[in-house]
């Protein structure tokens, strides 16, 4: 099974600001999610550039799902607080983050779990089926409800 998608680009405002991002419009950050040239700039999730673990015959990006995005954001926020309070920074390497994903594929879906986002992994499994689709639908409803009612 192969899925081919068009190249993903960052937003125009970031991509077109000299020195802010790479050619594709993704922000370069370190493991504290701080920009190397702009110390007051932190970024997380889809906005950041994550280096692929190796070269492939066909250029590909690195998936940035909700779970690692949340981990990046928590690290960035903790480091903003650390900057304000003069405390040491925390670091969270993308490669070391666990992989948790419920992917919707129409009327089906997949639950994906791994001990690391990127290879090499010691443990990983994928469970396809309609249950994953319904889990995704249920989680989306819960997530939106919880945010509307300030249950974070």
Regions found by a protein language model. Name each.
Residues 1, 5-71:
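FAD-site-proximal beta/loop scaffold in flavoenzymes
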Residues 75-152:
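C-terminal, flexible cofactor-proximal segment of oxidoreductases
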């Amino acid at each position: 099974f192969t899925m081919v998608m068009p190249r993903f680009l960052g937003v125009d405002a970031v991509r077109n600001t000299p020195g802010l991002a790479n050619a594709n419009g993704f922000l370069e950050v370190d493991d504290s999610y701080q920009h190397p040239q702009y110390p007051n700039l932190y970024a997380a999730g889809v906005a950041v550039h994550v280096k692929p673990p190796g070269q492939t015959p066909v250029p590909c990006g690195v998936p940035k799902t909700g779970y690692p995005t949340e981990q990046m954001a928590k690290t960035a926020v903790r480091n903003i607080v650390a900057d304000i309070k003069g405390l040491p920074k925390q670091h969270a390497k993308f490669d070391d983050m666990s992989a948790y994903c419920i992917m919707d594929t129409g009327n089906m879906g997949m639950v994906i779990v791994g001990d690391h986002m990127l290879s090499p992994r010691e443990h990983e499994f994928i469970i396809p089926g309609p249950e994953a689709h319904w889990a995704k639908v249920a989680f989306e409803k819960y997530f939106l409800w919880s945010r509307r009612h300030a249950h974070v």
